[in-house]
């Protein structure tokens, strides 16, 4: 049995990188009590299995505070002073280490090749590994991929895909309980692997035998992980230039791709729908929602009024973490004919209104619409990870006739 297992590992990862990973897989088989694994099937009914890290929570609170105080709008700041539209938190599914050699397992499935990835860094909780890691320590890290869709009857999966290895230095920041390891190259290797085709790498993905005493290892991880993830990879990315120029609503795209979205009663869907078909289903969901009727107004001029959004009412509480409610505001009221400066028309709206005043039916009447919007910071479940994004155009700041 041991001879067969060793030969299987040699096929799994070719070349010089195999030593550390071989030891890791061998260690999994021989000493499961020292190996930490949290691979479980996660569904929308058990979102507690995806704890919100303190880093992501602090990030959201920081931006939320800035928005409440009308701070400068912008994307989250990267550690290297770049900018990012989206920050994803990938918790390590399992890990092992011996000396300065680490083996980390992540699920990279949620990463989109259409985004522009700026930076990726692995964050180690110094408190959990005190004595094993330190700032300025040289380490070598082997990265494996394990898909969350890979399941067995017991909820455990032993299918791994080698992504790459990196050598570098652990860094720390002042007043921080984390040490970090830059892993941007691993993200590039992951997408390079996908571009070349999975067929070349099928020999690297092997089914391993079920770990002995897996349940005890699972309980041990939960005891160690009651407050925060011990190892997470933060991936900072920007939406593509094409997507930015298209003006497509980013929140609708996130909702369409969310596997946690609960379709409200009356909207038909298809079970186990593939990701590329969720957009169509989501459009049906949106079309089935009733529009909120405008408040009664007797020739009230265009103005901004309250419009409270409760994500639970539309079934989005299953994938949105923060905020659960917010005031989006909306515009209502009439536009005078012709318009004047009090309703903030642009030049085109002014000419359209003026022409329609003198020649009835020459052009449609101008409408009371948002003319200035602001963003909303949101934290939500993104597949089996947690993401932070500053969605633009979520709150009406000013209304006018255009």
Swiss-Prot record:
Glycosylation sites per record: 37, 238, 340
Keywords: Cleavage on pair of basic residues, Developmental protein, Disulfide bond, Glycoprotein, Growth factor, Secreted, Signal
Paired cysteines (S-S): 302-368, 331-399, 335-401
Signal sequence range: 1-18
Induction context: By dorsal-mesoderm inducing signals including vegt and other nodal-related proteins. By sox17.
GO terms of biological process kind: dorsal/ventral axis specification
The organism's place on the tree of life at top rank: Eukaryota
Expression by tissue: During blastula stages, expressed in the endoderm at a higher level dorsally than ventrally. Expressed in the deep cells of the Spemann organizer at the gastrula stage. Expressed in the notochord (a derivative of the organizer) and neural tube during the neural stages.
GO CC terms: extracellular space
Entries under InterPro entries matching the protein: Cystine-knot_cytokine, TGF-b_C, TGF-beta-rel, TGFb_CS
Chain residues in the propeptide: 19-278
GO molecular function, one term: cytokine activity
UniProt subcellular location: Secreted
Functional summary from the UniProt entry: Cooperation and regulatory loops of multiple nodals are essential for mesendoderm patterning in early embryos. Plays a role in mesoderm formation and may be required for neural development.
Protein family membership: Belongs to the TGF-beta family.
Subunit structure, as described in the record: Homodimer; disulfide-linked.
Protein name: Nodal homolog 4-A
């Amino acid at each position: 049995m041991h001879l067969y297992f060793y030969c299987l590992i040699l096929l799994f990862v070719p070349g010089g990188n195999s030593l550390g990973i071989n030891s890791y897989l061998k260690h999994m088989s021989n000493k499961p009590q020292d190996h930490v694994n949290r691979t479980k099937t996660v569904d929308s009914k058990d979102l507690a299995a995806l704890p919100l890290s303190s880093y992501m929570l602090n990030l959201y609170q920081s931006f939320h505070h800035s928005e409440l105080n009308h701070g400068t709008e912008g994307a989250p700041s990267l550690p290297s002073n770049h900018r990012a539209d989206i920050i994803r938190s990938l918790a390590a599914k399992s890990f092992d280490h011996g000396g300065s050699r680490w083996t980390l397992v992540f699920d990279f499935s949620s990463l989109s090749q259409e985004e522009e990835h700026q930076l990726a860094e692995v964050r180690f909780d110094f408190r959990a590994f005190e004595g094993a890691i330190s700032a300025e320590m040289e380490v070598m890290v082997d990265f494996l991929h394990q898909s969350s869709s890979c399941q067995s009857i017991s909820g455990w999966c032993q299918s791994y895909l080698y992504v790459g290895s990196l050598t570098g230095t652990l860094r720390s920041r002042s007043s921080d309980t984390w040490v970090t390891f830059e892993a941007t190259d691993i993200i590039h290797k992951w997408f390079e692997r996908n571009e070349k085709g999975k067929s070349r790498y099928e020999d690297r993905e092997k089914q391993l035998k079920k770990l002995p005493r897996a349940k005890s290892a699972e309980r041990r991880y939960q005891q160690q992980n009651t407050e925060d993830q011990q190892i997470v990879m933060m991936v900072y990315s920007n939406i593509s230039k094409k997507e930015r120029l298209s003006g497509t609503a980013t929140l609708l795209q996130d909702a369409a791709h969310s596997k946690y979205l609960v379709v409200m009663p009356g909207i038909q869907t298809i079970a186990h729908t593939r990701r590329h078909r969720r957009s169509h289903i989501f459009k049906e969901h949106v079309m089935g929602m009733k529009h909120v009727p405008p408040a009664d107004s007797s020739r009230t001029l265009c103005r901004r009024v309250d419009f409270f959004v409760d994500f639970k009412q539309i079934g989005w509480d299953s994938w949105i973490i923060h905020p659960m409610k917010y005031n989006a505001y909306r515009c209502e009221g009439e536009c005078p004919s012709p318009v004047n400066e009090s309703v903030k028309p642009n030049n085109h709206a002014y000419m359209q209104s003026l022409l329609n005043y003198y020649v009835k039916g020459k052009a449609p009447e101008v409408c009371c619409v948002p003319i200035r919007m602001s963003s909303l910071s949101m934290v939500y479940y993104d597949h089996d990870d947690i993401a932070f994004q500053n969605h633009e155009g979520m709150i009406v700041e000013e209304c006018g006739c255009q």
